[in-house]
Amino acid sequence: MGNEVAVFVTSEFNRTLDPAAGNGSDHAWGSHWMVMGGQVNGAKMYGDKFPSLVLGGVDDAHDGKRGYWVPQMSSDQVAADLLLWLGLPPEKLTEVMPNLKNFAKKSVGFMNG
């Protein structure tokens, strides 16, 4: 049964690295995903790179000093892997998820089978 089940966990937002005026952190771009199951091509981090965590560094976007990460992949690309694994034909991906037309790589590749 382990090869027939995938558990997908996500967060809908990210946080800035630098606290806001009230000592909390502001909403930022991006999110985090975890996928578990027998068909997951696991023990890897997916994406082009892990961003620099330096305030004002090369990966700090927006105003360049708060610690905003720019996402490395779309949630649509992540969902595409799960949809393909569930049996959606590849030629139907952009019909089901029209935003995928904006990306050269349509899926991430974390599912086997």
Range-by-range predicted roles:
Residues 1-113:
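Feature marks hydrolase-like catalytic cores characterized by long aromatic- and Gly/Pro-rich stretches
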